[in-house]
């Protein structure tokens, strides 16, 4: 038969399930290519490099040299003291939005628009700092790509270390 999603299959006694056939590998490669075409690929400088599930799967299934075709051009939102949102790296998996709503009971982030125009957002015209975000970072912890990351203070620390008017213990 055809390919059936594991999450929709009803288990049956004696059923044989194959999860690593040539057909499935080819199907997964196709999905990964589509995801990567809609994803701004700057893996070498991405904070998630080495921890990115999309990067892991691309390596695992031999998907390389995919050029972004039409990635989201929404601006990066670094207004929050804790979390940075880069919508161009979002694969619309929904892990962050479910975590924010269901685990934290906050709903600071969600998807807006429909179809190819769908983007991760805090609402039209709003930034994360304008929401009821508690800066818990759970959304970033759940994000499989670099769409949500914990804000780094490395630049501020280096500025302080290199400031001749300050005494800094390292």
Label each residue range with its predicted role.
Residues 2-135, 141, 148-168:
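Fe-S ferredoxin-like electron-transfer domains
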